Amino acid sequence: FWSPVHFPNQPATMGVLLDEKHPAFNNFPTDSYSNWQWWDLCINSKSIVVDAINAKPLVSVIDNFVTNHHLTNLFEAKVGEGQLIFSSIDLTTKLSERPVARQLLHSVLLYMNSENFVPSNNITIKNLNALKLEGKQSDFSAKDIYK
């Protein structure tokens, strides 16, 4: 049995869960749980604590029993008059060497440019600014949406 209590210097999450039929994954073959292709994505991501906001995770990161936070590394939301996909998965670095990240980015961008991209949950800019990334306050700006 693996536990952060017994192995405190290792990652404290227990895998991911997702709706593999969600249109964001139409061009990204996956199961509803972390499989081989999630290895690179998970080691190149940060889990975001979304306990206090109305985030709709596309990928739910399973927290351990000690902290039991609502975690994600990919979610969608309406913000004001707009809508967004928030990713704390690195989908920009060395994509020529990371085919899985490249394919997830491709699938998410196709989804965002489709009629299916209609997030049902509302969050505010204040909610985004309050997100915690690895226990530290994160800063977000308009520059974050550009490569």
Where are the regions a protein language model picked out?
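Short amphipathic C-terminal alpha-helix that caps PH/PH-like domains
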Residues: 100-113
